[in-house]
Amino acid sequence: ICPRILMPCSSDSDCLAECICLENGFCG
């Protein structure tokens, strides 16, 4: 489950839990 928090990212490793880095530059 990915927490619904807007987090800027450049790669999946910047994101929490099962989130991935989306094309818009945020985790999701």
UniProtKB/Swiss-Prot annotation:
Which GO molecular function annotations are given, in alphabetical order? serine-type endopeptidase inhibitor activity
GO CC, alphabetical? extracellular region
InterPro entries in UniProt: Prot_inh_squash, Proteinase_amylase_inhib_sf
Keyword Secreted present in the record's keywords: the answer is yes
- CDD domains xrefs: PlantTI (cd00150)
- Primary location class: secreted
- Pfam families from the xrefs? Squash
| Disulfides per UniProt | C2-C19, C9-C21, C15-C27
| rRNA-binding found in the keyword field | no
* PROSITE patterns linked: SQUASH_INHIBITOR
Alphabetically sorted, this entry's keywords are: Disulfide bond, Knottin, Protease inhibitor, Secreted, Serine protease inhibitor
Where does it live in the cell?
Answer: Secreted
Q: Can you quote the domain comment?
A: The presence of a 'disulfide through disulfide knot' structurally defines this protein as a knottin.
Which family, according to the similarity comment? Belongs to the protease inhibitor I7 (squash-type serine protease inhibitor) family.
UniProt function note: Inhibits trypsin.
UniProt name for this protein: Trypsin inhibitor 4
